[in-house]
Curated annotation (Swiss-Prot):
InterPro entries: aa-tRNA-synth_I_CS (IPR001412), Arg-tRNA-ligase (IPR001278), Arg-tRNA-synth_N (IPR005148), Arg-tRNA-synth_N_sf (IPR036695), ArgRS_core (IPR035684), DALR_anticod-bd (IPR008909), Rossmann-like_a/b/a_fold (IPR014729), tRNAsynth_Ia_anticodon-bd (IPR009080). Its main location: cytoplasm. Monomer. It catalyses: tRNA(Arg) + L-arginine + ATP = L-arginyl-tRNA(Arg) + AMP + diphosphate. It is found in: Cytoplasm. Keywords: Aminoacyl-tRNA synthetase, ATP-binding, Cytoplasm, Ligase, Nucleotide-binding, Protein biosynthesis. One of its GO terms (cellular component) is cytoplasm. Gene3D superfamilies: Arginyl tRNA synthetase N-terminal domain, HUPs, Isoleucyl-tRNA Synthetase, Domain 1. GO terms for molecular function: arginine-tRNA ligase activity; ATP binding. This is Arginine--tRNA ligase. It comes from Rhizobium etli (strain ATCC 51251 / DSM 11541 / JCM 21823 / NBRC 15573 / CFN 42). HAMAP family: Arg_tRNA_synth (MF_00123). It comes from the Bacteria.
Length: 585
């Protein structure tokens, strides 16, 4: 049961019973009616702007219309009180019986409470991480990995089919540089003294095992080949090794993709996929020969003061037209982007999400233009940019460097503070805002450490069940038993906790619609705070304790409330990819 959609329907039913509304129904936009929690909880449980948005088209005063709506709502047995505030907002306070039935429905649904049909089964392709396969993942990749994975989990919970994809950038010049770096390590494995790694090559020791494996398998044969012969062999071995390392890094973070798509497949068979994509755009009139004026500021790599084959992307929302084929006949990196999008669209995806680093901000408009041009506006593409993560230790910055070959890897962070701390904290800021990650703070056992605070709430819930079994020998209650006992939940403090649980379905849908998984982390912290606050009240008010060893019925009723809290915490934590522990030490 979704409290807010339920009362939205009830409010609209009440409106349909008003003569003036019925007379002008065709002129009214019920879609503008909002039903949500009031900003101040003391005003009620549900608030609506119905009178505010309908008064003008009805030719009446908002407060006067509110009074008429209120009269209808007072006929509802689940409404304990209803009033008008300010210029015409309507605040509704719900009856205890409604909260009890809602609690029973939460208990009945368990970890499926809050699941939505919002997506209506539509499949979304979420592409995230897509780090160049040039080495182990560093902490900079971590945020995009977590945001993309949590978003995919959220969309699945909201009723979407989801495919998680990783785009392997294995066709660019950086792969040639990587292969030459590995070939140097291969020569080293053969016993050659290579000295200092030349500037421009990858210096990391993580390439040593790849060189050793080539030496073991090929001996000196590669050494005696010209570069054009050994290059494809070394490339294949290196990319396989790097992607195996990246998969292990992602698994340590509990990130698993459905598809790993190789950029090289777009260049296979004479770049057939790229040629086809350009031909399709040509047929639609989006491709022409021309020379672009030099852009202001730093020149992009694909700019030439010569005639090129260009995508008329300004016609579909971009700032400038984009080169597809250079003057020498080679394809630009952007041409591969076009072919990749077409590949996704041809696979049947009409909704696609790209989770990219903040350094890709300049790609947003061109990717959106590609989506419009390739799909004729049928596909929806969203680009989410993840801002930088800054590492600290006790407030002091932690330096990270990749050029030197000595840098903070994703695995380093996970091994030091744990997967759960990394995942939850990467979601504890909106992806578009910079994130400070302090190794000391995320391992504190305090309210100031969100992941500990939320997980501790779940562990406390589980401890209540253990306490109940100690207090009442042989106590074994099913969710069905707990749902039948909700009449024992009537204290205002308990009902406030139910009200917080009632927000979860709305949070799920709003977070999915806005593609903001951080909202789940924020909500979980708020729910944990409400639960801990209620727990602490029991210290001073014994009548509010979850377990009353002298009252079995009261205990069972409150176990139902605890079960509901634990269920929502568990499903919310699952969306974030974080464990819900039964015990914490």
């Amino acid at each position: 049961m979704n409290l807010f959609t339920d009362f939205e329907a009830r409010i609209k039913t009440a409106l349909e019973q008003i003569d003036l509304v019925r007379e002008k129904r065709s002129e009214l936009d019920f879609g503008r009616i909002a039903v949500e929690p009031p900003r101040d909880a003391s005003h009620g449980d549900v608030a609506t702007n119905a009178a505010m948005v309908l008064a003008k088209p009805l030719g009446t005063n908002p407060r006067a219309l509110a009074d008429v709506i209120i009269a209808k709502l007072k006929e509802d047995a689940d409404v304990a009180d209803v009033s008008v505030a300010g210029p015409g907002f309507i605040n509704i306070r719900l009856a205890v019986g409604y909260w009890q039935r809602l609690l029973a429905s939460i208990i009945g649904a368990g970890i499926d409470y809050g699941r939505s049909s919002l997506g209506e089964g539509r499949t979304v392709n979420v592409e995230y991480v897509s780090a160049n396969p040039t080495g182990p993942m560093h902490v900079g990749h971590c945020r995009g990995a977590v945001v993309g994975d949590a978003l995919a989990n959220l969309l699945a919970f909201a009723g979407y089919g989801v495919e998680k994809e990783y785009y392997i950038n294995d066709a660019g010049s950086q792969i040639d540089v990587l292969a030459r770096s590995v070939f140097l390590r291969y020569r080293e494995a053969l016993g050659e003294r290579i000295g200092e790694i030349p500037s421009g090559l990858y210096p990391g020791d993580y390439l040593v095992p790849v060189g050793q494996s080539l030496a073991a398998d090929y001996g000196v044969r590669l050494h005696n080949m010209p570069e054009e012969e050994w290059m494809p062999i070394v490339k294949d071995r290196t990319i396989d090794a790097m992607m195996a390392m990246i998969r292990e890094d992602l698994a340590a973070l509990n990130v698993h993709h459905d598809i790993f798509f190789s950029e090289r497949t777009l260049h296979a068979n004479g770049a057939a996929a790229i040629r086809t994509a350009i031909n399709d755009l040509t047929f639609k009139g989006y491709v022409y020969k021309g020379t672009l004026p030099p852009p202001k500021g730093q020149l992009p790599e694909d700019w030439e003061d010569r005639e090129q084959t260009l995508f008329r992307s300004t016609e579909v929302g971009d700032d400038i037209d984009r080169p597809l084929i250079k003057s020498d006949g080679s394809y630009t990196y952007f041409a591969a982007d076009v072919a990749y999008f077409k590949n996704k669209f041809d696979r049947g995806f009409e909704e696609m999400i790209y989770v990219l680093g903040a350094d890709h901000g300049g790609y947003v408009k061109r990717l959106e233009a590609v989506a419009r041009g390739v799909s004729d506006g049928k596909a929806k593409l969203t680009v989410l940019l993840c801002q930088l993560v800054k590492l600290y230790r006790n407030g002091e910055p932690v330096k990270m460097s990749k050029r030197s070959g000595d840098f903070v890897t994703l695995r380093d962070v996970v091994e030091e503070v744990g997967r759960d701390s990394v995942r939850f904290m990467m979601l504890y800021r909106k992806n578009s805002e910079p994130l400070d990650f302090d190794f000391a703070k995320v391992t504190e056992q305090s309210k100031d450490n969100p992941v500990f605070y939320v997980q501790y709430a779940h562990a406390r819930c589980m401890s209540v069940f253990r306490q109940a079994k100690e207090a009442f020998a042989g106590l074994d209650v099913s969710p069905e038993d707990l749902a039948k006992a909700v009449a024992g939940i009537e204290d205002p403090a308990e009902l406030q906790l139910v009200a917080k649980l009632a927000e979860f379905p709305r949070i799920i849908e709003s977070a999915a619609q806005s593609q903001e998984p951080h909202r789940i982390a924020f909500y979980l912290y708020d729910l944990a705070s409400a639960f801990h606050a209620h727990w602490n009240k029991g210290k001073d008010q014994p009548e509010l304790r979850f377990v009353n060893d002298k009252n079995r019925e009261s205990t069972i009723a409150r176990l139902g409330l605890v079960y509901a809290v634990a269920s929502v915490l568990k499903s919310g934590l699952a969306i974030t990819g974080t464990a819900a522990p039964d015990e914490m030490r």
